[in-house]
Amino acid sequence: MALHRDDICDRIRTLALPVIDSMNLELVEVEYKRSGREAVLRLFIDKEGGVTLDDCADLSRELSTLLDVEDLIPCEYSLEVSSPGLDRPLKSEADYERFSGRLIKVRTYEPYQDDAGNRRKTFLGRLEGLKDGSVVMSLTEGQTASIPLERIAKAQLEFEF
């Protein structure tokens, strides 16, 4: 029985986390994409101070061996390990606390109202942190927004010049 993409990502996450933790790294995201006979498995990692090329190479070697033994991916694939980049996604409550004070972009599933009464799906502003399960932001237009986590489709850091 073929596994669904989300199931593969969940199994990879479960398999990879002990290795990642032992290397004092943080797993940001697992991405699996298949196109025809080709597939790509991407793991995005981070650590305080940023990841190095050696971190990525070391983890790639460790995981390659483990993935070959476990045989979770039903076809040939390429394994890519990298940093999440300057526009790092925010996935966990800890991310919202860690990156408090940074400029972020948030997209909601449906239009949501900011504190000035404007309804929209995209918010750009300074992350103030979490309060009662909501992401609190000072928006670039001067308003504020408090967006419940369950309404957020995507959130990411924004590069500042």
Swiss-Prot record:
Pfam families assigned: DUF150_C, RimP_N
Superkingdom: Bacteria
Gene3D superfamilies, A to Z: Ribosome maturation factor RimP, C-terminal domain, RimP-like superfamily, N-terminal
Major site of localization recorded for this protein: cytoplasm
Subcellular location(s) of the protein: Cytoplasm
CDD domains in UniProt: YlxS_C
Keyword Transmembrane: no
Single Gene Ontology BP annotation: translation
Keyword annotations from UniProtKB, A to Z: Cytoplasm, Ribosome biogenesis
Any one Gene Ontology cellular component term annotated for this protein: cytosol
Described function: Required for maturation of 30S ribosomal subunits.
Sequence similarity: Belongs to the RimP family.
NCBIfam families: PRK14647.1
Name recorded for this polypeptide: Ribosome maturation factor RimP
Native species: Pelobacter propionicus (strain DSM 2379 / NBRC 103807 / OttBd1)
Gene: rimP
